[in-house]
From Swiss-Prot:
Chief subcellular location: secreted
SUPFAM superfamilies: Lysozyme-like, Plant lectins/antimicrobial peptides
The protein, known as: Endochitinase 4
UniProt note on tissues of expression: Expressed in pollen (at protein level).
InterPro entries from the UniProt entry: Chitin-bd_1, Chitin-binding_1_CS, Endochitinase-like_sf, Glyco_hydro_19, Glyco_hydro_19_cat, Lysozyme-like_dom_sf
Annotated organism of origin: Cryptomeria japonica
Gene Ontology process terms (BP): cell wall macromolecule catabolic process; chitin catabolic process; defense response to fungus; killing of cells of another organism; polysaccharide catabolic process
Modification after translation (UniProt): The N-terminus is blocked.
Enzymatic reactions: Random endo-hydrolysis of N-acetyl-beta-D-glucosaminide (1->4)-beta-linkages in chitin and chitodextrins
Keywords attached to this entry: Allergen, Antimicrobial, Carbohydrate metabolism, Chitin degradation, Chitin-binding, Disulfide bond, Fungicide, Glycosidase, Hydrolase, Plant defense, Polysaccharide degradation, Secreted, Signal
Signal peptide stretch: 1-34
GO molecular function: chitin binding; endochitinase activity
Length: 281
């Protein structure tokens, strides 16, 4: 026997379907509150939404604690500016006996760079090249030309006991590690929360995992300081020095400022871009 829908049942079906569509749209709006990303501790999906899980952190993930196992893209984004040859010319000067020799790899850098939306990709070609040169210049200075992974002969465990949000773990030290020498428990804790590693209980991973090491440096550059804004808004390389170590500026340590500037000029030349103005701080 054929069942015929009555007018009322058709109406009910219509309103039920409409309600379902509205509900789905509301859910999408709720998920998309952080559209275009920048949400602390979450992944930015390939469609520009913040969240967690494979749909957000998997293939196409743009920034945050991405888990995609896909090989890093080297033809677009930062990879189109920094080829493996250019990268090796920048970091390859470390002597064979240096701990950093072989640690700072191209694939790790590209993976870290691609995890942060806008890093080296948010401006004109010249602006993007200057940002990459500025990042590497400060990293080269901090690591002795990429010779070191960890701070040499630290005189402190860099534990701020007054910081209750990121309390120090017993027996752990939070001395400088990685390209920008991540230091202090509160920075390890915050970076770990954003990138998703245990920065407080396992700070050593910043000195043993090349990708995480680079990610902490790009995190500091993009999230924890105004380095990215400074170099992309025309404030000049000197503003990145002030953001990283303001004590060097205004005559505080002319030699270290000169070291950073020399690296910056060298890397700008390698990337075929002028340095811009305001190199000192």
């Amino acid at each position: 026997m054929q069942i015929m829908a009555t007018q009322n049942s058709k109406s009910n079906i219509f309103w039920s379907s409409s309600a379902s569509v509205v509900l789905v749209l509301l859910l999408l709006v709720d998920v998309g509150v952080c559209q275009n990303c920048g949400c602390n501790g979450l992944c930015c999906s390939q469609y520009g939404y913040c969240g967690s899980g494979e749909a957000y952190c998997g293939a196409g993930c743009k920034e945050g604690p991405c888990s995609s196992s896909s090989p890093p893209s080297t033809g677009t984004g930062v990879g189109s500016i920094v080829s493996s040859d250019v990268f090796n010319s920048i970091v390859g000067g470390a002597a064979s006996g240096c701990a950093g020799n072989g640690f700072y790899t191209y694939d790790s850098f590209i993976s870290a760079a691609n995890a942060f939306n806008g890093f080296g990709t948010s401006g004109s070609s010249d602006v993007n090249k200057r940002e990459i040169a500025a990042f590497f210049a400060n990293a080269a200075h901090e690591t002795g030309g990429f010779c070191y992974i960890e701070e040499q002969n630290p005189t402190s465990i860099y534990c701020d006991a007054s910081n209750t949000q990121y309390p120090c773990a017993s027996g752990k030290t939070y001395h400088g590690r990685g390209p920008l020498q991540l230091s202090w428990n509160y920075n390890y804790g915050a970076a770990g929360s954003y990138i998703q590693f245990d920065g407080l209980n396992n700070p050593e991973i910043v000195g043993t995992d090349s990708t995480i090491s680079f990610k902490t440096a790009v995190w500091f550059w993009m999230v924890n300081s105004n380095c990215h804004t400074a170099i992309t808004s025309g404030q000049g390389f000197g503003a990145t020095i002030r953001a990283i170590n303001s004590m060097e500026c205004d005559g505080g340590n002319a030699a270290t400022v000169a070291s950073r500037v020399n690296y910056y000029q060298k890397f700008c030349q390698q990337l075929n871009v002028d340095t811009g103005s305001n190199l000192q701080c």
